[in-house]
Amino acid sequence: MARLKEKIQTDVNAAMMQRFGYKNVMQIPRLEKVVVNMGLGEAIQNPKGLDAAVGDLTRITGQKPVITTAKKSIAGFKLREGMKIGCKVTLRGDKMYDFVDKLVNLSLPRVRDFRGVSPKSFDGRGNYTLGLKEQLIFPEIEYDKIDRLRGMDVTFVTTAKTDEEARELLRLIGMPFRAE
């Protein structure tokens, strides 16, 4: 079993029950899925860049990403409907717990001038989105093998009803929120 999953079952659930006074164990918010998205604007001019991004995302998450396409044509960006413009991975189960554990304990502390993640990036429905500026913070990515820096969005989808519940869940999991 994943290390983080055990921590959630033993420590986090008990703390959440006490803090919010849930009457039933099934009321406790939990992580449903983690979506890692990499939008690539340069894929319009350079389709080879998409292959490198897919390789990076595969190494980071341990799962093959799905390639995303443009929904609408935008003339200003020279974008046509159906063009490949990014990739994303949806993680659930043990792979999700392993990724979150690695992100919180290994990757985020490697970010330059890191003072914590913003506590304001909740969407009002208990989901949290985190933007990363470079893929180098992950231990699977070797500095010599990348062609350019690529950022990504990591979205934590929880079953929490409010942002406060989701913030507490992520804080107990180990997400280093910045003091504001």
UniProtKB/Swiss-Prot annotation:
Pfam families: Ribosomal_L5, Ribosomal_L5_C. SUPFAM superfamilies: RL5-like. This is Large ribosomal subunit protein uL5. GO terms for biological process: translation. Gene3D superfamilies: 3.30.1440.10. The keyword Ribonucleoprotein applies. Belongs to the universal ribosomal protein uL5 family. Coiled coil: none annotated.
